[in-house]
Amino acid sequence: MITRLIHPICVAVMLIIASACEKYEPDWDIFEAYGVAEEIKTDFYERYSEDVKVTSAVTSYNKSQVEFVDTDGLKCTAVYKGHTWMMTQKEFNKNGFAFLKQLPERIAKAYLRAGVSKEFYEWDQSYVIEVTRRGFDKKAYEFQFVVFDENEFPKLAYREYFVLIDEDGELLDIRSRHNRSIWWYDMSGCVDFVRQKYPEATILAGINDSSDNVLYIKDKGVLKTVRFDYRGSDEQTWSATIYRLEDYDKLPDTVLDEYAKYRVYHPDFNYSEVYRVETKDGIYYGLKSATTSLTVYFKA
């Protein structure tokens, strides 16, 4: 009789313990636990829904950073300044070029058309990310990698490359390494300037080059690069707007005269591309050599 009673009693005790554990399990709120404002939590879940998995939420001074895994299983980071969302970065799997299957098809095709080869993504500093910024009209896709120089010795010699593609699959730039976008999350001042100076423009992407912000815009169908100078304390001052001219665009007579004088001392110089550079000091024209990376500038 005693043996028969032991089993039901054990079962009852286990059920009570399980019920108690379920009842007293703490309601873990990672935002509250690390002092992240309720306003940020509310905005975050309105922006990304409760289907994402938040892995970290931290506030330091006036900056908050929320790390999470989205519904596609990709690691993301949202950055807030005060209670205002500034940007979100989504990371794609760089190993084995897995990102080519994770990216939107038009972005993957644009990357393959960019003309780069022998990319090495196993480098610690390499990455493939999607960047969404406050005030920008489009998302941007950044690819950071290295290419080993086979003509150099030792074989460890390499060059860093950065490819920038906009949301519609247009190649915006191929250049050397720049600062990580997440370090320069606030470009609101530069956005305000572009909205005033180029009211019809579409803001496509933004990067930071040696502390200077660079915005890529499409203004009346023309792709332009808007550069700013860093003045400290997040202040950026416009320095130049640069864009390539079409082959049929005529150069000002003053530029043609200066080019003729230049050719007297540099008879082998011929240009294949022309860039218009707008600055506070006036308009310049950059004539890019047809055979080298040299660009010669003449003031209009």
Regions found by a protein language model. Give the residues of each.
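First exposed extracellular module after export/assembly in secreted or surface-exposed proteins
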Residues: 31-300
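Bacterial Sec-dependent N-terminal signal peptides
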Residues: 2-5, 12-42, 48-51
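Compositionally biased, intrinsically disordered low-complexity segments
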Residues: 5, 9-20, 110, 132-134, ...
